[in-house]
Regions:
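Amphipathic alpha-helical interface elements
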Residues: 1-153
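ATP-dependent helicase/translocase motor core
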Residues: 120-410
Length: 410
């Protein structure tokens, strides 16, 4: 069998070996597969320190090393998530004898993609992506001499460190530029996107696990839990046979729908299509979770993302896009992070229309009074323009005023 990791043999044989062994163990020895995949992440992190002559952190743990490389600007948030995912699953495999063929299939393509990024950043800058092919189920590894295997891995790791230490020093600005370019061009599957979304949701307080917290596995809204339930059924006829990628529940209240897409998709168009259709098509048996209706919608908030951090230059193909369905004139907007369960409840409780009404009716007496701020007409016009931007739902506004015209007072 040709390994997906063969492209590493010349420049990084240690990574090629770990990847090939992980593929061979995938179905016959999942525990060993996950350990090999974890070693890919650990080896890449250690080699990055050596190639770039970066001092290891004082608290020289795996977490601290990954975090330092992130602070140095060498790792994007999606790569950090993959490295931590590989680290965590390896720890479970080592310390709990954990095994899961489903996790093998999740992490194998992600480890391959990570290796492609590493090749493009620390090896051949002109390397071109090759699609990952999942090993066939009849791939079985024969009798393995574990002692000989460990000896080979140790020798290859030592060789890799020697090669990294002897490599020409690349200017840090050039390395960061190449690392960013390779990360930005790295293809992501919907499975990886889901993995990244799970991580991001957990960080802000949601219980999220696409593989286990699924409707088909019996997960249901539960009092006291903030659940992101994967593959939630609706009556929609569009998309994934009517299954929303995630339904968000604060306790037993249905507050949001998430649609996850591959990186090449235009995200706002997903909001307008599946993102709006799923909230229209909530099943009758799920109406007990509906907190209100807004026209044809039975869910207040809808989201779409591809797991990619928000980039202004790739505005419609990055970030988390959000639409508040409670008002028909609301437009989709890009967020830089997920809303927490508390944040959603606060937004639901906020009387935005009432506050906008108060803002419109607020007197300008203090602003115009000679004993007050005594603002000039152009300053009042600037304030009115800013208020209009707020009332219309804009997230940003820019006031341009010349030097000496009272910007601070305005």
């Amino acid at each position: 069998m040709v390994s997906n990791f063969d492209f590493l043999k010349k420049d990084f044989p240690v990574l090629s070996n770990f990847g090939e062994m992980a593929e061979k163990y995938c179905y016959s020895d999942s525990n060993s597969c996950l350990m090999k995949l974890g070693m890919i992440g650990e080896t890449i992190v250690n080699l990055m320190f050596t190639y770039d002559r970066i001092a290891f952190p004082h608290d020289n743990t795996a977490v601290a090393r990954i975090d330092k490389l992130s602070r140095e600007g060498l790792l994007t948030s999606d790569l950090v998530a993959i490295l931590h995912g590989l680290r965590k699953v390896r720890n479970k495999a080592v310390h709990e004898n954990y095994a899961s063929i489903a996790d093998d299939k999740t992490f194998l393509p992600m480890a391959h993609s990570l290796c492609e990024w590493f090749m493009q950043t620390y090896g051949d800058w002109n390397y071109s992506h090759k699609d990952f092919v999942m090993p066939e189920e009849n791939t079985v590894l024969g009798t393995v001499d574990k002692e000989a295997e460990e000896k080979k891995e140790s020798e290859l790791t030592k060789l890799a460190e020697q090669m990294a230490a002897a490599a020409p020093i690349i200017e840090q600005t050039e390395r960061k530029k190449q690392a960013y370019k390779a990360a930005n061009q790295r293809p992501k599957t919907e499975a990886e996107t889901r993995f990244l979304i799970d991580e991001q949701l957990r960080m802000v307080g949601w219980d999220a696990d696409t593989e286990n917290l699924r409707y088909s596995k019996g997960t249901r809204p539960t009092k006291g839990r903030n659940l992101a339930i994967a593959e939630y059924p609706t009556n929609s006829k569009v998309g994934n046979r009517g299954y929303a990628d995630y339904a968000l529940f604060v306790g037993e209240k249905l507050v949001g729908i998430i649609e996850a897409k591959a990186i090449h998709k235009d995200i706002p168009s997903v909001i307008d299509y599946q993102g709006k259709d799923y909230p229209r098509c909530i099943r009758k048996e799920d109406e007990k979770y509906v907190i209100d209706t807004w026209g044809e919608f039975k869910v207040p908030f809808t989201f779409a993302t591809n797991g990619r951090p928000y980039l202004e230059q790739y505005k419609t193909k990055s970030g988390i896009w959000f639409l508040d369905l409670r008002k028909p004139d609301n437009s989709p907007m890009a967020l830089r992070g997920w809303m927490s369960p508390d944040g959603m409840e606060e937004l639901l409780a906020a009387d935005i229309e009432g506050k906008n009404k108060n803002l419109k009716e607020m007197s300008y007496d203090l602003l115009t009074d000679k004993d007050g701020l005594n603002l000039r007409p152009y300053q009042l016009n600037a304030i009115r323009a800013a208020e209009e931007a707020v009332i219309s739902g804009k997230q940003t506004a820019l006031l341009a005023m010349a030097t000496g015209t009272g910007k601070t007072r305005t």
